Amino acid sequence: VAEQYFLGTETSERYPLWTRANVGEVFPDPVAMSSFDFAFCNADGIRMSELGWRDAYARIGAFTEDEFDPDNTVILGVFGGYAYLNASVMRIFGERAPGLSAAAIDAQFFGAQPGIPDYEPHPDDASPEAEARIGATFGWVLTTDGLPEVLADEEMVDALRADRPDFGAMGDLELLDWAEQILDEHFRHLFSQHLFVTSLATLPAGIVTDVCAALGRPQDALKLLAGLGDVASAAPSLVMWDLGRRVAAGDSLVEAFDVGLDGLEDRLRALDDEGARGFLEAFDAFLYAYGCRGPNEWETSCPTWETEPNLALAAIDRMRLSPESADPVGRQTGMAVERERLGTEMVGMLAADPETQGQFGAALGSAGIFMPGRERTKTNCIKLVHEARMAYLEFGRRMVEQGVFPEVTSFAMVTFAEGRDLLEDPTGWREVIEERQAVFDEVRELQEPFVIVGDPPPLSTWPRRDAIQVDPVGVGESIQGVPGCPGVSQGRARVILDSHDPTDLEPGDVLVAPLTDPSWTPLFVPAAGVVVDVGAPLSHAIIVSRELGIPCVVSAIDATKRIPDGALVEVNGETGVVTVLEV
């Protein structure tokens, strides 16, 4: 094992607790050099993601700039190659925020965290000034009727896509300059918007959860946060469903899909009947609108639906086999109707306490703004990253042709400055890239610590993922996770470790997955239920599951290793319990 990864950040004495929770879902692999350079830090200092998060906390009023190290990242760290969130900072936000707590932040964002220590107050954690500032912001959260800035950002990134230049006509240096320019101009702002809205979404979610618990109806909290509508990250699944219906209705399309995923896009584009032409027109429109989504989509070197359309076709392939009863629009409508019914009922139950009644009603309305807003702000970031990705891929193709890069995606192994250097003199860069890639590949096979307190353990002590042994769940035994989306379902467990190849998942199966970034969420539609190793109620994919109405349990630790593939299981999305019924 390599003695150390080729990049990383410092730990923090003031904020010593780091976690893979939440960030591990969106950065499952080690961080590549190019992402570290623009998002974390480089020779010039702290970079866009850290700065954007600090901007968000300052805007909320939770922290002042002098509470953070000016020279080192504090909120986002990279240890042993893996991205970590600083749980100490997020817990302090919870403690300072009126009506929240460190425990509430843990529950909403992190779910079950094996090995995480209890919150211990630091003398500087309490801040009456910060509490007052946050309180004023919270007042706005509960009264605003929309997020117009977020919609303006959406228009901006959509315009970038519409005005995408002809990368093939640009020079090598122009490609690098263009990608760096759009990231430098926009990413800090977009990421700050994302964390601003994300942090504030904890308020309505927390109020709804607390009031439901006080009324003796804790199981209804998730139902009141479901069926919100206008969730950007759920939209692709709805369009894919329609595409799947087109396939199911077209004989030539069915035949093309039945052959298998290999070469599927080429077979489809060779068809010339009316149904096939209609499908391809709709599919191309889908790729234009949602082509930025994919596995590990924050990382520019990873594939997306535009760069590898078969990733999207694989999910459509599963949906085409589903019965009409699996229509996500119908499920979403049902969740929305139930949300309205429950909301009216519970507001009525609070008639004797007008203050709480008013706050609860405001929280229900606010949840409908800030939880979809969280997904839209993330989507705005991903759209921007994707435009940079497309420029990088053109650059990578050219460097492969010139013999500088071993792979098109080798751009991920160099910084902006190094990219310019190798254009001036490519001598030796291929060897440097291959050495870094070898370390990246080696570290990707290691199981990183879920929680770090203080300094991270050396890489030499991290076990290989394939060497970790756990006991399988037997008949009648259960795994206790965290409720993600209400509902109870049964089905055969299908352990799918890679969203690139979901062909074992049949309609009515229970999807058991290690994580669920947006490339996984379309697979929720044909599934009877979803079980995930990690996650929490405010995880991105869990918000999507509540829009699609799929019973879901998250933070079911080691479920992909412990639940036998093919076992009949029951998923209880209200209690968070997954039970093996037979094997």
Predicted segment positions?
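Acidic, glycine-rich flexible loop/linker segments
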Residues: V1-S12, L17, A21, R494-D509, ...
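N-terminal, non-catalytic alpha-helical interaction modules of very large eukaryotic scaffold proteins
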Residues: A2-P372, E387
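Residue-level detector of short coil/turn "hinge" positions at structural boundaries
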Residues: Q219, G294, P406-E407, C552
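Extended, domain-scale alpha-helical bundle/helix-rich regions
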Residues: A362-P456
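Protease-associated
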Residues: Q4, T9-S12, A159-A162, A169, ...
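Glycine-centered helix-boundary capping/hinge motifs
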Residues: G216, G403-V404, G549
